[in-house]
Design a protein with these regions (language model features):
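Active-site neighborhood of phospho(di)ester-bond hydrolases with catalytic His/Asp-centered motifs
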Residues: 1-3, 72-75, 92-97, 118-123, ...
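Active-site metal-binding motif and surrounding structural segment of the metallo-beta-lactamase
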Residues: 1-12, 20, 88-93
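Catalytic metal-binding/acid-base residues of hydrolase active sites
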Residues: 5, 41, 78, 97-99, ...
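Short, well-ordered alpha-helical microsegments
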Residues: 7-8, 80-83, 103-104, 128-130
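Binuclear metal-ion centers of metallo-dependent hydrolases, dominated by the metallo-beta-lactamase
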Residues: 11-14, 18-27, 106-108, 112-149
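Core dinuclear metal-dependent hydrolase active-site scaffold
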Residues: 21-87, 102, 145-149
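Short, surface-exposed connector motifs at secondary-structure boundaries
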Residues: 65-69, 89-91, 112-118
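Active-site-proximal segments of metal-dependent phosphoesterases and phosphodiesterases across multiple
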Residues: 85, 91-112
Length: 149
């Protein structure tokens, strides 16, 4: 479990940290908070000119960790191999938004691959929480609009 005293120290420390731009794979620490930039990009989703909506190497997701607690924010991405760095996250925010990120099926596949304890869909226009819930592995709690499904 996360020590709340350490979290207070981390939050206090954030006020005094400098801002740095991270590229894919780079990390920075501020007190007990560690931030790692992860790739976020498209493989299949492309503009009419053939260019991906999100180009590999340009966009980031982020892993924030304090001790053993890990939060993953995927950013604008599809289900890509690099999502493996988020396996077992305590909290994961995954995008579900065609045509720019993941379909329902890809969202479910990515969630079951990562196996976060708590899953929050983001960037969605429409969502069927009951259908998604039925397809998730046991042990993954799904939250939509702040409510557990």
């Amino acid at each position: 479990s996360t020590n709340l005293k350490n979290m207070k120290k981390t939050i206090s420390c954030i006020r005094h940290c400098s801002i740095e731009v991270l590229e894919n794979g780079q990390s920075i620490s501020c007190g007990t908070l560690n931030i790692t930039a992860t790739p976020a990009y498209n493989i299949n989703r492309k503009r009419s000119n053939g260019q991906p909506f999100h180009i590999k190497g340009e966009g980031n997701g982020y892993i924030l960790s304090i001790g053993s607690f890990k939060l993953f924010f995927a950013g604008d991405t599809e289900f890509i191999p690099e999502l493996s760095v988020a396996k077992g996250a305590d909290i994961a925010f995954l995008p579900k938004n065609l045509p720019y990120t993941m379909s329902d099926e890809e969202f479910i596949e990515a969630a079951n691959f990562i196996k976060p304890k708590n899953l929050f869909p983001i960037h969605y226009f429409e969502i069927d929480p009951a259908a998604i819930r039925k397809s998730l592995l046991p042990g993954i709690s799904l939250y939509v609009e702040g409510m557990q499904v």
